[in-house]
Amino acid sequence: MTNDTLTPRQQQVLDQIRGHIRRTGYPPTRAEICRALGFRSPNAAEAHLRALARKGAIELRPGTSRGIHLPEEAAANDSDGLPVVGRVAAGSPILAEAHIDRHYRVDTHLFSPRPDYLLRVRGMSMRDAGILDGDLLVVHRTHEARNGQIVVMRLHDEVTVKRLEQHGSRLRLLAENPDYPTIEVDLTRDDASLEGIAVGVIRNEGLD
């Protein structure tokens, strides 16, 4: 597919998706596309997204409001490797260039859903889940997760890896090590956001 096959409006939608991912690190929802481009209803955005998917410009993943994937990102990851995220500065997207220590070649087809980045683990709070200090956590970028999944959460100015337990607007972030406390989060009050779900781990001994 080349951009020449897109209508001007489809190109505008594709550019908006790319720009949103560059700014925030994740794709927009249908409602966000509507607001950005002045569509009157999410149905209009959905029609353009389905047209872009038919032409191969994007992939639509069912079951999530941000289920828009750019094949060009996957191709870049396959050739360059996945970005390895180290320390994350407050207030900036997790995949901001300043956070990326290096790229590491991974066969992304070994993981499901497809991973988007690697997070360097710090500490032993997830020891009993087999996630150790210095390991690389293989992460699928998403803003939706199920109870029991291991998640990457941004909480205030810190990024943490924990097992998720959610009851409405209240979260419990559970460590897999009895030496670490459970973190209680109230989404109506606390500055918290989901940065992805764990889909695998690369042991520290196998790095470099």
Curated annotation (Swiss-Prot):
Entry's EC annotation: 3.4.21.88
Keywords, in A-Z order: Autocatalytic cleavage, DNA damage, DNA repair, DNA replication, DNA-binding, Hydrolase, Repressor, SOS response, Transcription, Transcription regulation
Family matches, as CDD domains: S24_LexA-like
Annotated catalytic residues: 125 (for autocatalytic cleavage activity), 162 (for autocatalytic cleavage activity)
Reactions this protein catalyses: Hydrolysis of Ala-|-Gly bond in repressor LexA
Domain of life of the native organism: Bacteria
Protein name (database record): LexA repressor
Taxonomic source organism: Alkalilimnicola ehrlichii (strain ATCC BAA-1101 / DSM 17681 / MLHE-1)
Species lineage: Bacteria, Pseudomonadati, Pseudomonadota, Gammaproteobacteria, Chromatiales
